[in-house]
Design a protein with these regions (language model features):
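Flexible "cap/lid" loop of the alpha/beta hydrolase fold
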Residues: 154-204
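Glycine-rich His-Gly loop
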Residues: 77-80, 147, 175
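N-terminal cap/lid segment of alpha/beta-hydrolase-fold proteins
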Residues: 40-61
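Conserved alpha/beta-hydrolase catalytic His-Asp/Glu region
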Residues: 178-190, 200-257
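Twin-arginine (Tat) signal peptide motif
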Residues: 5-17, 31-32, 108, 113
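N-terminal secretory signal peptides
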Residues: 1-11, 22-27
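Active-site loop/oxyanion-hole signature of alpha/beta-hydrolase fold enzymes
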Residues: 57, 97, 104-148, 158-164
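Conserved HGGG/HGGXW glycine-rich cap/lid loop of the alpha/beta-hydrolase fold
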Residues: 60-115
Length: 257
């Protein structure tokens, strides 16, 4: 087994707790906060969050958040399409309050990062994540990726997981690997026509498409008896519309194929 894949395996009890917390937090997709009836008092460290930009080798500005003690174990969050690092805010606050250093970045063309016309593929996503990890000198990090972010994590671990000690564990939440697209070798995948529909909807009316997705299947608000939280829908829409239409269009191929 390649040594770069070993961090994906063999969770200790402590690692399992991190994984379970991340899975629960991501699966709920902020529903817990939406349903909260009592204030939650988090034990957050003093000093305040920090943020900044990292410049990649191809001159792309990648926005990042870096919260918590710099000597604590880092947990690095990788967001899904077409969102930003803001999608992990609730989870970052949770782990920050439990003593971890938490880091997240906006993928190129997403959020506050540069809106460039190229490099919207998994290889570049992983390279950009590596640029952030290098700039912040992250080691022994737990990488958590949701959806497209899961593909980014898998590629990051394989391509940039060495030297030993850089990556402690990887958590893939509802991730895209190994392949979403239906092919002869992947007959249970999603037909290409579905992704073509995404492209058509995005190109014709991105704003409405990004309203319909969270209002319907993304949070399960289209299910019978579901309680709809308008703030969550608007926050999803806000994150999506911050990014580049070109990055989002190209990203459909990146996450599906």
């Amino acid at each position: 087994m390649p040594s770069t894949l070993r961090p994906l395996l063999a969770l200790s009890r402590r690692d399992a707790l991190i994984t379970a917390s991340a899975l629960t937090a991501s699966a709920s997709l902020q529903l817990g906060a939406a349903h909260a009836t009592e204030p939650t008092n988090l034990n957050l460290p003093t000093g305040g969050p920090s943020m900044g930009y990292v410049t990649t080798d191809d001159n792309v500005q990648i926005f990042y958040k870096d919260w918590g003690p710099k000597d604590a174990q880092p947990i690095v969050f990788h967001h899904g399409w077409p969102l930003s690092s803001d999608d992990w805010d609730a989870q970052m606050l949770f782990f920050l309050s439990n003593g971890y250093r938490v880091v997240a970045h906006d993928r190129r063309g997403h959020g506050r990062s540069s809106q460039v016309d190229s490099g919207h593929d998994i290889d570049h996503y992983a390279i950009d994540a590596f640029a952030v990890a290098e700039a912040l000198d992250l080691s022994n990090a737990v990488h958590i990726g949701h959806s497209t972010g899961g593909g980014e994590v898998a590629r990051y671990v394989v391509r940039h997981g060495e030297p030993a000690g850089r990556v402690a564990k990887a958590v893939l939440v509802a991730a895209i690997p190994p392949l979403m697209l239906q092919t002869d070798d992947n007959p249970e995948g999603t037909p290409k026509e579905v992704f073509d529909g995404f492209r058509t909807a995005l190109a014709s009316n991105r704003a409405q498409f990004f309203r319909d997705v969270p209002a319907g299947p993304f949070f399960g608000f289209n299910r019978a008896g579901a309680t709809v939280h308008e703030g969550m829908i608007q926050n999803w829409w806000r994150q999506g519309m911050m990014g580049s239409a070109k990055a989002h269009y190209d990203g459909i191929k990146a996450f599906s194929e």
